[in-house]
Structure formats: structure tokens, C-alpha cells
Amino acid sequence: MRHLALFLSAAWLYCLLGINTVLAQGAGYRKITIESLDEDVAESEQTLAEFSILAAAPLGTLLSRTGWTVTCSTSHSGNPCSRLTDGNAGTFWHSQYEGTVAQPPHTVTINLGATRVITGLAMRPRSDSSPNGWIARHEVHTSTDGTNWGSPVAYGTWFGDNTEKFANFEPRSARYVRLRAITEAGGNNQFASIAELNLYTATAKTQNTATGTWGATLDFPVVPAAAFIDPPTGKVIVWSAWRYDDFSGGNRGYTLTSTWDPATNVISQRTIQNTRHDMFCPGISMDGNGQMVVTGGNDAARTSLYDPATESWISAPDMKIARGYQSSVTLSDGRIFTIGGSWSGGEFNKPGEIYDPVAKQWTLLPDAEVVPMLTQDHQGLFRSDNHVWIFGWRNGSVFQAGPSTAMHWIYTDGTGDTISAGSRNSAPDAMCGNAVMFDAVAGKILSCGGSTSYQDRDATTNAHLITIGNPGDQATVQTITGGLGYSRIFHNSAVLPDGSVFLAGGQGYGQPFSDAQARLTPELYRPSTNAFVTQTPNSIPRTYHSIALLLPDATVLVGGGGLCGGCTTNHFNAQIFTPAYLYGSNGQLATRPSITGGSTTVAIGGTLAFTTSGTITSASLIRYGSVTHSINTDQRRVPLTLGGSGTSRSAVIPNDAGIMTPGYWMLFVMNGNGVPSVARTILVTA
């Protein structure tokens, strides 16, 4: 047998395998073993390559372990606590597994000897042939005195393998750090084991409640590249692709997902196989019945439904045209429209089609053409029909706001039609920018950021206020003076209960799978001033494949980025941003009004009755969102006019299905200081 050992960059490996993608700068090097495939070679030796997968490390640099005192809640005599920091990845600490077996949670506590600024923890699992003790569910706590630990600074579930795991978090001053190992990967035993444990340090940062704060980090077992909220339970479902850390080589017929339950803070993992659908780079929309419809992607023709009643995934008929990176949107009658998507399924002009959740069938609309809305991307059609900004509107119409400079109305009756709705003034194409309907009653849409091409071009600061009326009318476009404070591409936006729009992440130059020029300072668009103001920066880059969603408690989940296999920009985590409206002038969390009872369903044009505690002065409905690749066509906000008095209030729902798209919405009430309640879930029916 001929045998050759080489050191190749991850990018070279991808070229060798013929994978068409771009990896991050600074991708790590792997030892690649290439072996002969002669017939006389044993099958066990016919391996193309093996390499470890990296994740994004915490902010800063490794902290010296000099002066540390490490204690473990339990140890096996042959695997003492001292092996955690012996500098030898071939040895490991292990919880007691003989005699009286120690039960989880198992804890490892580090006394640094002095107060330091800590930004994260690195845990290297044992790397021998046994998976015993690989840690899954975990928490990381910090303390200044070793007695008061408070809530975790990071928590979640790590994927079960022997690659190095990180728990990244905002800088914290601490003398003590504790890792709690709650469950073992696979759930087979009660053990915990660690080969090496390290901490990261950086310069201290101050969180300012006047511009919002960043909370604990949620660790997922997958890179959360797509997400939605299950309205009846409040659980957040995220997924990556057929692998937890990579999308390439897809079309495997299954997807790795993870679920965060905010009620328990438990993060679980699940592989979806029954739908035979790799759901990376899909269209995502909630239909009028509240089911999530996920289309295309790596398995480009497939359709999968998430049923909130049973928390299960169901197969639906294939689309008429295979698609990937297409957009989809819910129509005024609850059906789903999709268009474009030449990233997968072939490069050709892909007109619209409609999914009917009642008839359970797709109908092609050959005259709902995509050609008029193509961008002038330097990569051609492969990119120019991606991630279209579309909004369901009156009488089954769809408004296309971008990313092309040209805007359009799409009609979905008969064989469909696409007509001009004007242009975003003189602004260039804005691929991978954002568009958010922050006031559906007034037809107000904010568009911001993006670039003239999908990648390898500078991002812009361009921002516009778009106003739409009746289908077929030319849209009114106002250029927002000054634009964004930071140029952005691959960012995400979430509309808030008060009508402002929160923008997070992105980068100044479009380079997928790189964190270069990452925008760590978020911004807030305020309609009252028609301007953007910066918010409190965070420490974890959120660039390509990142997500953001408004949560029912009026905070924003921001996470993900990467999904590039052998790279150092895989972000297996998310953070919670708490906007300033949840704080009082004293810097403490404000007392919130609450919705104490009332309707949970309402028909379009009907009256929504509810009771509250505290005095409220305003209310709004925000449709539950879904997000991938900076596109969230589900979210929109409807301000409400309040009726009633005292604690018994009501609001008449607009009698317009173009405004009140059927499906699940979040009802928020706000007091005179603008402090919002936790939302009440409302099902709006046609």
C-alpha cells in the first residue's frame, strides 16, 4: 500500500472534494491522510481524510493557568482533578465510576487566585476511543467571592464528540469560574470527563442599560443558521444542515435541529429524518393555520411542515421547481408563495409558485416572473435571485421591496403576474440587506444595508423608508438621511413592540464564513426620528448564517454564524439582547405591565378583548417570526387602537387580511413609560 501524509488547509480540502464554497480567513490546518484505494487494501484503511472541526473561540487570549486552584466535586482515583490542567490532552479527569458512582451534576471550580476579566471557557473532551463522560448539558457560572454564583453566564448543550468545546460570554470580572456538567452526551451514563480546561481573558467592557444589555449565552449542539418560535409553547427551534457544523455535501435527506425551551432553559437536540429533507438554506413561512412551511435548500424540491400542535415534522408535496436560497411569504388567505432560488436545484429563471395548505398541493405561476427582480450580482443567476424581500399584501398580492433596486408587485391569481412598483430611488442593489414591515397599518417598511453583490463587495449604509398602498400603486420611497451608523451585510433585524427596529451583526465587507469587519455594535431605528442610534456592543461576531428573532418576553435572540466545516468561525451559540425599554431610569429592570386574561383567538376584523394589570397606554400585535440568511418575511407589526378602560381593554383588529396575515401573533401592551408586557399568543384567523 502506498501511503502519504500531508498538511493541507481546510480550503484546499474543499477544493479537493469539489465543494463550491468560501471558507473563513484563518481557517485552521488539519493533518490529512491520503491512502491508496487498491483492491488489496483493507476497507478500514480506505479513508480519504480525517480532521477535527473547530469552533469560534471566545474573545481575547488564553489566560495563564499559573496560580490556579482547581477542585472537582468528584474524581476517580486513576483520573484525578489535577489532569484538567496538566497540559497533556492525552490524560483526563473523570468523575467517580467505581464503587458508589457519583451522580450529576458534576462540578469543576477554578480559583484564579485574583480577579480577572473572563470571556469564555474552553473544554477539551477526552480523545481516546471511549466517549464516556463527554459533557452535553452544562452551565458556566462566575463569582467574585466563591459563594455567590448567580445565574449562569452560559448554558446549553454541546454536541457529543471529542472536538474542543467553548462557552463564550460577555466579559465578566471574576475570581472563580465553575463548570457544571449536567448530562453526558448520548445520555448513556452519569459520568463526566475532561482532558483540558482553559479560560479566555480580554479587556473589560461596560454594559449600559440606557442602550440595552447582553445576557447569558445559549450553547447549541448545532450552528443555528435557521430558526423559528413554536407559538403555543414558546420553544425556539433552530437547525443547521445534515451536519451540526457544515452544510456542504448536503442532499442527505435529514437535518440536525435543536430546541431551546425558555421555560426550563433546557436545550435539546433532534435529528429530523422522516421528511427526507436537508433543510439548509430554505424558504420559511408560517401558513394561515400556524404550521411552519419549510421549502427547498440542500434537498431542493422538498417541503416540510412543522406542526405546533404535536411538535412534529411532516412531509408535504415537493415544489414544482427545485429551489435553494429562495424567499417565501404568507399570503392574505394563508397560502404560501415562493420565488427564485438558483443556489440549488439548477440555475435558471424560477417563477413563483403557491402552496395551498388545505389542498396540500403546489401550483406553478409561470407569469409571476423572477427576471424583473434579478440583481446585477457579479456571480450571475446563481446569486441574483436569492433572498428576495417579499411581503404578503391585500387580495393575495405580494410586494417585492428588494434586494434589487427595482421593486415590484406580484399577483398570484391565475397564472400570476409581475409589474413594476418603482425603485428605491438611486440606491444600488442591496443583496443580503434587511427589510422589515414595522407598521403594517400604514404600509411602512424599513430597508437597510446590503451590498451590490452577494459577496466580495463592500456593504453599504443605505437605508430607506418605503410606503405601500393598494396593489399596483407605485411605492413611495424616502432615503433616510445619514443611513446606518455602520455599513452592514448579512445582518438581521427584528421589529420591537414599540415600532422601533433592532439591527444586529453583519460585516462591512461581504465575505461568507469570515468574521473580518464584524459589526459588533447594534443599532436601533426609531420611526419617531427616522434615524438610527447605536446600542450596547456585544463580543461575539454575528456574520454570515446568523439569526435574530423577537421573543415573547420582548427581548431579542441573536445567534449563529459560520456553518463552514473546518473553519474557526462556527458559532454554536446565541445571546439574548434586553432592549433599553425594559429598564428604568435607575438602571434596574422596570416593573412590567401584564396581560392577565382574555381572548387567544380572533378573526380578521374582529374585536380582541383582554385584561391587564397596571395602567397601559398602547398595544401592538407582532407576527411570530422565522429567519434564515437575514430573511424574516413572517414578522410584521400592527399598532392597535385601544378601547375599554382600566384593566378591561379591547382592540378592533384591522379588517384587512393583507395587513393581518392569518397565523400566530404576539400581543404586547405598554405602559406610559413604554415598558412592554410579556406577549400573549393570539391566533388570527381568516
Sequence positions of predicted segments:
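Fungal secretory targeting signals
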Residues: 1-24
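A short, hydrophobic/aromatic-rich structural module that often spans a beta strand
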Residues: 58-72, 139, 167-172, 182, ...
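Predominantly extracellular/luminal regions of secreted and cell-surface proteins
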Residues: 52-89, 389, 436, 462, ...
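Kelch-like beta-propeller repeat domains
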Residues: 203-686
